[in-house]
Structures are given as structure tokens and as C-alpha cells.
């Protein structure tokens, strides 16, 4: 079965309406599987509600921002937004890649970039009054630098408009372009993050072919080599069919790359068309993996069923800086 493309209209910086073909919620699988309604109690999150959540939702819409909280259907959106924190996604909401776990739209943005986005994002952060922001983006393989210069411009705009705000840059792999990595680092984020996502064996099955296990490790190692003063961070999803030996191998590889902070969480299928969950990892197993991480020398490890790379990122950063 071929992917179902939809046509969307975007306004270019020159005011021209551009039509793009996208696959909503990613390519995923051709044959959707039944929804799993027997999820264990430990991974159920409360529905988003409350005045703070509604206020943030309205502000995001008003300022025309994209958040990974919404685009990736994150189960923690209610908790995070109620506490006034969110992960801002820049460079649009159309990704040039099609990872099998991700619900972000897939297509070709044709080089479109909103030059006003850094200013709008900085204004939103200032108005929200947050002290810590996670900045991430879709993959933009259609851009010469993968969007690194836009990423850096947004970090600088935030720091200029809202002095004192701490910024975590959760970047794409820029196709292994180390100059692009250096461009982002030059904007002085407090944390540089790139997610390994899964173990070596499952990477071809889970991630887009343009991503790579070794490529992510290379990016993280280079970031630490160039800017040892900046904390590096990565994340693993569990429950995709990996073994404990493979989890430990991935953790060791991340430590060898100089990664300071590690998060581990349960993979949850965003739609029936995405990769099925192979196993629901119980909380006690996450506790063991967390202990492994500290034994390996990570400065901070945050592991649990609902943990995501940007979940409680401000607290994780604080813990890492105090060790």
C-alpha cells in the first residue's frame, strides 16, 4: 500500500503560497495493527487540563509555534504544560525523514524557512516566563546546513530577549556534518542533545535510513570534544525488542562518546500504523537500568516508563550540574 499524501499550503517568506505534499503522522507501516488497549497502569498519564495548560495552548497557537509535545503526541503534555514548560520545535512541522516510531509529518519542505521564527520563539519564551527551554527541530535534509544556522539564530534570539533562560538544544544529526554541529555549539546552549533512540541492531528497523547509530555517536563525541564545557545528552526508547545486553552496550557506547546525561523511557506507539510495542518495561527494570547508568559514569540518569528526552529537563540539568 502506497503512502497517502495530502496537500498543505504554506506561506513563503516572500508572501507566496507554496503547496507541499506531506504524509500526515509520518510514513509508518502500510498495514496498521490493532490498537493495544491493555496498557499497564504504570504508563497511563492523566488527560491534559487546567488553566495553565489552556493558556499555553492559546499562546502557542497565537504565536504560530510548533511544539514536539503536540506533534509527537507526547503523553506528558498535560504535566509539562501545567508546570509552564514545553519543548519548542523550529523549522516547521514537516520532516524530511520517516522514522517508524515518530508521528511528525513527513514530506519535502522545499527549503522553506521562516526568518521571523527566531524572534517569535524568543518572544514566546519571554512571555511565558520560563527559565529553561528545550529547543528541537524536524530533520531538514533539504537545507545545505540542515538548519543549523537557523537553530543557532533561535538560541541567540532567546538569550537576547530573555537573559538568564537556559537552553537545551536537541538537534538532528545534520547528516553527520560536524561543521553544522559547531554552528549550534557556537550559540552557547547549556546542553547539546542528540538522541540515539534505540540499540544498534534495531536502528535500521526503527530509524530513517539516513540516520545511523554510529553517526549519532560521532555527532555527540564531536560536540563534547569541541565544547567540553557544554553538557551532552542522549535518550533511548525501550520496548522495541531490544535485549538487556543491547541496552547496556548502547549505554557504554554513549559514555564512550562523552555523553553526560542519559534518559530512558518506554516506547509508546503514537498511532496504530507505527511500530508495535514489543514489551512494556516495568518500573523496577528502569530502576536497574538507571543504576547501570550511574555505574558507567553518567552525571545524571533519568529512567522511567513515561520519561522522554525533554521530560523534566530543567530538573535533570540541575541534578547534572550538582554532581
UniProtKB/Swiss-Prot annotation:
Q: What is its EC number?
A: 2.8.1.8
EC class name: transferase
Nucleotidyltransferase as a keyword? Answer: no
Instruction: Tell me the cofactors it needs.
Output: [4Fe-4S] cluster
Residue ranges of every copy of the Radical SAM core domain listed in the record: 81-299
Q: Which Gene Ontology CC terms are recorded?
A: cytoplasm
Pathway(s) per entry: Protein modification; protein lipoylation via endogenous pathway; protein N(6)-(lipoyl)lysine from octanoyl-[acyl-carrier-protein]: step 2/2
Q: Which domain of life is it from?
A: Bacteria
Subcellular localization is given as: Cytoplasm
Which positions in this protein are listed as binding [4Fe-4S] cluster 2?
Answer: 95, 99, 102
NCBIfam families registered for this protein in UniProt: lipA, PRK05481.1, PRK12928.1
The protein here is known as Lipoyl synthase
Which organism encodes this protein? Thermus thermophilus (strain ATCC 27634 / DSM 579 / HB8)
Amino acid at each position: 500500500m502506497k503512502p497517502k499524501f495530502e496537500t498543505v499550503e504554506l506561506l513563503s517568506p516572500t508572501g507566496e503560497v507554496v503547496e507541499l505534499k506531506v504524509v500526515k503522522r509520518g510514513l509508518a507501516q502500510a498495514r496498521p495493527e490493532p490498537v493495544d488497549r491493555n496498557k499497564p497502569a504504570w504508563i497511563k498519564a492523566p488527560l491534559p487540563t487546567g488553566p495553565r495548560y489552556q493558556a499555553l495552548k492559546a499562546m502557542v497557537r497565537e504565536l504560530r509555534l510548533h511544539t514536539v509535545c503536540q506533534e509527537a503526541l507526547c503523553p506528558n503534555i498535560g504535566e509539562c504544560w501545567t508546570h509552564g514548560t514545553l519543548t519548542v520545535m523550529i523549522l516547521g512541522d514537516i520532516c524530511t525523514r520517516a522514522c517508524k516510531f515518530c508521528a511528525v509529518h513527513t514530506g519535502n519542505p522545499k527549503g522553506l524557512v521562516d526568518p521571523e521564527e527566531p524572534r517569535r520563539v524568543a518572544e514566546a519564551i519571554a512571555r511565558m516566563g520560563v527559565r529553561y527551554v528545550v529547543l528541537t527541530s524536524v530533520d531538514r535534509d533539504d537545507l545545505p546546513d540542515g538548519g543549523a544556522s537557523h537553530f543557532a539564530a533561535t538560541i541567540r534570539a532567546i538569550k537576547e530577549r530573555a537573559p538568564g533562560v537556559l537552553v537545551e538544544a536537541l538537534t538532528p544529526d545534520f547528516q553527520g556534518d560536524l561543521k553544522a554541529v559547531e554552528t549550534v555549539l557556537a550559540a552557547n546552549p547549556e546542553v547539546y542533545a542528540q538522541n540515539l533512540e534505540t540499540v544498534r541492531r534495531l536502528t535500521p528497523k526503527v530509524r530513517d535510513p539516513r540516520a545511523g547509530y554510529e553517526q549519532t555517536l560521532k555527532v555527540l563525541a564531536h560536540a563534547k570534544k569541541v565544547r567540553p564545557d557544554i553538557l551532552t545528552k542522549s535518550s533511548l526508547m525501550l520496548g522495541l525488542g531490544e535485549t538487556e545486553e543491547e541496552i547496556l552496550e548502547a549505554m557504554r557506547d554513549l559514555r564512550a562518546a562523552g555523553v553526560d546525561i542519559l534518559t530512558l523511557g518506554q516506547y509508546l506507539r503514537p498511532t496504530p500504523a507505527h511500530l508495535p510495542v514489543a514489551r512494556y518495561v516495568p518500573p523496577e527494570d528502569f530502576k536497574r537500568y538507571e543504576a547501570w547508568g550511574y555505574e558507567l559514569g553518567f552525571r545524571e540518569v533519568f529512567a522511567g516508563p513515561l520519561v522522554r528526552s525533554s521530560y523534566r529537563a530543567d530538573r535533570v540539568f540541575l541534578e547534572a550540574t550538582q554532581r
